[in-house]
Amino acid sequence: MSSYVGKSFSKQTQDASSCRMHTFDNYGAHSEFHESNYAYEGLDLGGSFSSQIPTNSLRREAINTTDRARSSAAVQRTQSCSALGSRSFVSTHGYNPLSHGLLSQKAEGNMEVMEKPSGKSSRRYQNGDYFSDKQQTNSTQRQNQSQPQIYPWMTKLHMSHESDGKRSRTSYTRYQTLELEKEFHFNRYLTRRRRIEIANNLCLNERQIKIWFQNRRMKWKKDSKLKVKGGL
């Protein structure tokens, strides 16, 4: 009985030792056994390359196919939307902004673009030119300012003929002529101070007073000569 127990115990110890030697001493078998645990996407962290897992590759292929299908569907949608938008815009307004630019005009007719009624101004695009209401109003205002209104009392009685080289003839009122005749009766030659005083009183200038006295003296001399000849 004791011999049987001893043999069985010796067999167990041998099996355990062989198992330990297999797990810890055989390094190559251990690395091969745990090879899949240390591999990350086909790259072995220990320095060796391992093959990819077939399940991961299948999943990636399926994901790639779905992404491609989604991208192709999105591209088709955008193309269809752009085509529809361009057709509708061309049909409604008569020109295609995608092919000819936003400001291109159809050769068959003219286009008029008006802003909202609440807008400040309206624009018209006709024959390649812009016309705005603001510009028209500004031009009219400038013309009105450049041409001031002339009232009748602002006009002169005798217009000047400066283009002909002649000066305008001054017209005197009845009151002015009477005052000048009184002054000429007392004094036929005026000083400059007296001439300025009369000009201020009669609302005339010094030159007009001087010319009137010169003409009056010439007339007086002519009359005096005629009287002398008639007396002889």
Swiss-Prot record:
**Localization:** Nucleus
Q: Which PROSITE patterns match?
A: ANTENNAPEDIA (PS00032), HOMEOBOX_1 (PS00027), HOMEOBOX_2 (PS50071)
The signal sequence is: none
Provide the GO MF annotations for this entry.
DNA-binding transcription factor activity, RNA polymerase II-specific; RNA polymerase II cis-regulatory region sequence-specific DNA binding
Q: Which residues bind DNA?
A: 165-224
Q: Low complexity: which segments have biased composition? A: 135-148
Q: Segment Disordered: which positions? A: 112-148
Q: What is its main location?
A: nucleus
What is known about what this protein does?
Sequence-specific transcription factor which is part of a developmental regulatory system that provides cells with specific positional identities on the anterior-posterior axis.
Regarding protein family, the annotation reads: Belongs to the Antp homeobox family.
The entry's protein name is Homeobox protein Hox-C5a
Q: What is the originating organism of this protein?
A: Danio rerio (Zebrafish)
